[in-house]
Amino acid sequence: MAKFLREKPSNFKFSLHDAKIIDIDYDYGENRLIFKTQSGFIDIERNEMVDGEIILEGVSWEDSYVYIMEYKNVLTGNVGSFIGEKMYLSNFVDAFYSKFGSFDVMSEYDSYMTYMLSGFLKRGSEELEANIEIFYNGDIIYNVRG
């Protein structure tokens, strides 16, 4: 039996862990998605926050989804019952500015043509849990200010 090892990528320079996304912009013509943060994101090598925005290119809108979970009788993020909704990423982006206040990133995952964010979504005074699953075939660009 042949054994193949899948190595973990070692070239991650930035992390969105603890980033607060306050706006999401998109360009359907160019299939680009832009995450704008309140305080930036982590520069892993320097272990500090840097200001900027994140751009995903080659987004497939019909293959990208957002899962929103509203917990019942338990604090958001804990084990327990919830009700939820799965929606197209495009519908979520259209509603983000008017319906949601921000998205606090807890973790991110980048794999072959799939980029996922999980965290907590603000809706008024409510905290919801959300997973954003983006199918893409382009680059991830970190525009760093300063």
Pin down the residues of each PLM region.
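Surface-exposed, interaction-prone regions used to assemble/regulate multi-protein complexes
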Residues: M1-G146
